């Protein structure tokens, strides 16, 4: 792997964590968060929901199976990638490993370097995660080039994750259509940073997907594309910045259109319902998060990546469908009278367990009932 120079993670409270730099030689700012996922770093790094964030991995061994080729595809979308490029601002790990896997095309170090993303290894990530868990997520910078760290700290304290619209940075500028071999339905996806894993699950079920930009009128698109339903995707950032989007979603409620939301999509459906959103102290990010379905009484393990949640008492026309068994936060909602469902977690996983792929089947049943 060669000789790696020193690098630093600087936090808004003045803490400076020293490590060894890998990836690109640069400076990147972001909200510092962590994931407890043991595997799936290519999926995590390319997840658009991480835009604007520096990601810490609690699992100490990263890079063990390298980075696979994008030529491995399903429904025309590359496997093990959740978008076309790395979306995190930086990656902080404990050990940078030499890969040994048949599908590996390059090392983690090479991949980050190619995409201009800095990394830091040789860090006690579990101690760092304990700090964030106790004090909450905070702004920071990953520095892998020579610079004045005092100046970096000043810059950190000027940035605001809460007031930045990251969705517009990851949403497409024009519509994108994905067509399966046997089309049963057509769904308009309000693309706020949709994961490829979600698209793959929709396409597997015979759903033609029309991805539209975040600031388009969802109802107008639904009718112009002669769609059967609407899907509100995951995405990065503060949901309360997207109140105009929530208003447009609210208009679609009046048409009784089948709808489904995931992650940010659930939060926007709740905002459209007049509910309140709050920020979690350190978020839910990992692939082993327990969730309970209040209707069936069943529990399952899920993949999660969110920093905000719904205030359950503030829901009006929706009811709580699922809850997180760690902190009882809202993980799923259903409309009381309209064909609308949503989850806060990611039923497609990617990476993670497939315990809740059935949620997509529930959406298909709703579409079938309205056909």
Curated annotation (Swiss-Prot):
Pfam families: CPSase_sm_chain, GATase. It catalyses: hydrogencarbonate + L-glutamine + 2 ATP + H2O = carbamoyl phosphate + L-glutamate + 2 ADP + phosphate + 2 H(+). Residues 1-182 are annotated as: CPSase. GO terms for molecular function: ATP binding; carbamoyl-phosphate synthase (glutamine-hydrolyzing) activity; glutaminase activity. L-glutamine binds at residues 49, 235, 237, 264, 267, 305, 307-308. The keyword Iron does not apply. Keywords: Amino-acid biosynthesis, Arginine biosynthesis, ATP-binding, Glutamine amidotransferase, Ligase, Nucleotide-binding, Pyrimidine biosynthesis. PANTHER family: CARBAMOYL-PHOSPHATE SYNTHASE SMALL CHAIN, MULTIFUNCTIONAL TRYPTOPHAN BIOSYNTHESIS PROTEIN-RELATED. Composed of two chains; the small (or glutamine) chain promotes the hydrolysis of glutamine to ammonia, which is used by the large (or ammonia) chain to synthesize carbamoyl phosphate. Tetramer of heterodimers (alpha,beta)4. This is Carbamoyl phosphate synthase small chain. It comes from Pyrococcus furiosus (strain ATCC 43587 / DSM 3638 / JCM 8422 / Vc1).
């Amino acid at each position: 792997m060669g000789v790696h120079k020193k690098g630093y993670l600087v936090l808004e409270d003045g803490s400076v964590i020293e490590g060894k730099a890998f990836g690109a030689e640069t400076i990147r700012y972001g909200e510092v968060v962590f994931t407890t996922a043991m595997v799936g770093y290519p999926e995590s790094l390319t997840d658009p929901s991480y835009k604007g964030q520096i990601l810490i991995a609690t699992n100490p061994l990263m890079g063990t199976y390298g980075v696979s080729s994008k030529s491995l595809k399903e429904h025309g979308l590359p496997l093990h990638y959740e978008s076309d490029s790395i979306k995190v601002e930086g990656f902080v790990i404990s050990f940078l490993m030499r890969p040994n896997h048949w599908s590996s095309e390059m090392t983690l170090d090479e991949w980050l370097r190619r995409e201009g993303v800095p990394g830091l290894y040789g860090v006690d990530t579990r101690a760092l995660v304990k700090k964030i868990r106790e004090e909450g997520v905070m702004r920071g910078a990953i520095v892998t080039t020579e610079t004045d760290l005092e100046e970096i700290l000043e810059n950190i304290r000027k940035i605001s994750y809460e007031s930045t619209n990251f969705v517009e940075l990851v949403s497409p500028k024009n519509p994108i259509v994905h067509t399966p071999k046997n089309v049963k339905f057509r769904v308009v996806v309000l693309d706020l940073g949709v994961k490829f894993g979600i698209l793959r699950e929709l396409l597997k079920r015979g759903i033609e997907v029309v991805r539209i930009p975040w600031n388009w009128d969802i109802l107008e698109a639904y009718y112009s594309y002669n769609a059967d339903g609407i899907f509100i995707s995951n995405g990065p950032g503060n949901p309360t910045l997207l109140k105009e989007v929530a208003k447009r979603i609210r208009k679609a409620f009046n048409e009784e259109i089948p709808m489904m939301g995931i992650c940010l999509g659930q939060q926007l459906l709740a905002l459209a319902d007049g509910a309140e959103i709050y920020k979690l102290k350190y978020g839910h990010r990992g692939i082993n998060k327990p969730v309970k379905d209040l209707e069936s009484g069943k529990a399952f393990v899920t993949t999660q990546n969110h920093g905000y949640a719904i205030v359950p008492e503030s829901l009006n026309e929706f009811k709580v469908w699922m809850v997180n068994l760690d902190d009882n936060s809202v993980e799923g909602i259903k409309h009381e009278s309209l064909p609308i469902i949503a989850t806060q977690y990611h039923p497609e996983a990617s990476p993670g367990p497939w315990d809740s792929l059935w949620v997509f089947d529930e959406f298909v049943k709703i579409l079938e009932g309205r056909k």
